Amino acid sequence: MTSTLATRLSTYSISLILQRIKIIKRCYSAPVLRDYQQDAIDACVNSIRQGTKRIGVSLATGGGKTVIFSNLINQLRQNYFKERQGNFKSLILVHRRELALQATATLKKIFPDLKVHIEMGKYDCDIEDSDVIVASVQTLIRRLHKYDTNSVNLIIIDEAHHSVANSYRSILDHFKASTAETKIPVIGFSATFERADKRALSMVMDKIVYHRGILEMIDDKWLCEAKFTSVKIEADLSDVKSTADDFQLAPLSSLMNTKEINEVILKTYLHKKQEKSLKSTLLFGVDKAHVQSLHKLFKDNGINTDYVTSDTKQIERDNIIQKFKNGETEVLMNCGIFTEGTDMPNIDCILLCRPTKSRSLLIQMIGRGLRLHHSKDHCHIIDFIGASSVGVVSAPTLLGIRSDDIEFDDATVEDLKAIQGEIIAKQQKIDERLRALFQTDEAAMENVTERNSVADWIHSANSVDLTLCSFDSFRNFTQSNNSYPSGKEFDEASEAVKEMELLMNSQYPWVKFASNAWGLPLKGKNHLRIYKEKSEDKLSMVYHLKMYRQLPCFITNKYADYVPKSIIKDANLWNVMSKVEKIINTLNSDLEGQTMQYQAISSKYSKWRQTVPTSKQRDFVFRKLKKVYGESSKDFIRLSLDDVTTYVNTKMTKGDASNLIFASSLAPVYPLKSLLRILEYQKRRSFIK
């Protein structure tokens, strides 16, 4: 054996052998990292050196997280060998087969000397012989008995927003890596550290050490440009039940999977295909039935289409994906399959036919189409938006545009930023006007007198909006032929005017639920309240802004219960309202799906708020008003129950109903009685005229 080897070696010169080794090394050398990829690695290494070892990297889909953590493993491995002897073993946790195969292929390509093993299904890992173990969480949780608690030196979690799940936490517990005192670095990678069930990622991660989102990646040309188009469909999402922070799929599918809506989706695709020469479109549907209906419709219209659901076998799924990558399939449809883990960079169009309240899900769907590819310059994102889409996130809302009234066609990120700038400029003009009104009492008074008569204005104004005001103060204020009161009366009237101007001119739907208290709903069953209360020295009044978070019923063992948090106290309501604006802007500016405990709401000027209420809303509001009216009918001289019925059936908008339902959840009588008093006063004015 030795002589044979010597004979073979004798036929080659030493220099030729070395040359071939260099060629092999060069073929398999790690690719040059992008600047931000190296920055992410450096941030992780520095954090570990400083003692914070449970860390996260937030990177937009298409940013190359597999390349990053492969190089990170290599760098930490090299640092380890510089400091000590022994083996360095890395564990990569994934929750999908595609992610496991992708990580394995990348590691073997970049670092061929590493022994990479898979722990998944039929693949049984040889722990002792491995440098890197890529493990399916579902499989590893059943095979933990194979692993010594000290057998790994590094844990990488792919798609780490799943890491709060019990299975992940059990694995981390096994390796003594579930607390901030862990000796093993735990590094999570995700496009969005936000969970639909709101379980705190702080249980697994102590710090997000690096973040780079979609907008930055597009600006720096690491992701392709997106062009956004919104298409209005006849779908009222307000009655669709929700679970956690997204819609229940069955009722959502019943609403979306109709002949009319599916025809709109088809016609939109055909128009865009002809106009933009689309070649590879990915469609997200609600559920299997929805996807199958759309597949049949598209196929009947001559479109080469295929679909994947959870029922699709793995071999068939792989074949379908490969055909799509090869350009043989024009439209690939799915429901919840391709939000993570599958790279299809040839996608040049995304059809969002699955409305969602989840920012993270929307970011994942959009991100599927933004990878760079030689066949495209940009990706068309077509969002099908219901006429009443309260609480639904869309591409524009991710970019900071809250208006439901603006429609887009091929709008780039720069276009949307320009629109956002226009909206901000308009709001600034409103703010400047309100600030001027607040400078002096006289300015506020003059603004009211320009209406000719406050009483006439009350007669013509929206009834629910008027419940924001201290109605008795305004009625007193308009007496004596609208002559100005003086002294204390003047101060009280002026203060009421200020409250009216700020609350009624706010772009958000405030409600008044007590004589000196107002509320503003936030998504997620949380809300803001402003209380007008005595200052600490009892000598003056201040406005106290609080944020309320609703506790789950399983914690309270009863119906809604809230945890309040004091935000600001100020004698000037303007300062409090400015703080509200900052809070909501802060929530809306978190564009890349970071965890948000509170979420902002749509504008009170949104188109859906002017539409007719649902039958459920009408019935609910009428029952509440009827009950309050019956208990205090003696307080109303001219108002009859028929008048209440007329208001609910002909005058109340969906926005009004939403306000009343929210207000009555905070106080069951006051807001409803205030509305009845407004209706009484408006009827009295009509009778006099």
Swiss-Prot record:
Entry-linked CDD domains: DEXHc_RE_I_III_res (cd18032), SF2_C_EcoAI-like (cd18799)
Subcellular localization, as worded in the UniProt entry: Mitochondrion
Keywords per UniProt: ATP-binding, Helicase, Hydrolase, Mitochondrion, Nucleotide-binding
Signal peptide (residue range): none
InterPro entries: Helicase/UvrB_N, Helicase_ATP-bd, Helicase_C-like, Helicase_Restrict-Modif_Enz, P-loop_NTPase
Cellular component annotations (GO), alphabetically ordered: mitochondrial matrix; mitochondrion
Main location: mitochondrion
Motif DEAH box mapped to chain: 158-161
UniProt: ATP binding residues: 59-66
Helicase C-terminal domain boundaries: 265-438
Residues annotated as domain Helicase ATP-binding: 46-211
Alphabetical GO biological process terms: mitochondrial DNA metabolic process; regulation of mitochondrial translational elongation
Enzyme Commission numbers on file: 3.6.4.-
Taxonomic superkingdom: Eukaryota
An example Gene Ontology molecular-function term: forked DNA-dependent helicase activity
Family: Belongs to the helicase family. IRC3 subfamily.
Additional remark text: Present with 172 molecules/cell in log phase SD medium.
Name used for this protein in its record: Putative ATP-dependent helicase IRC3
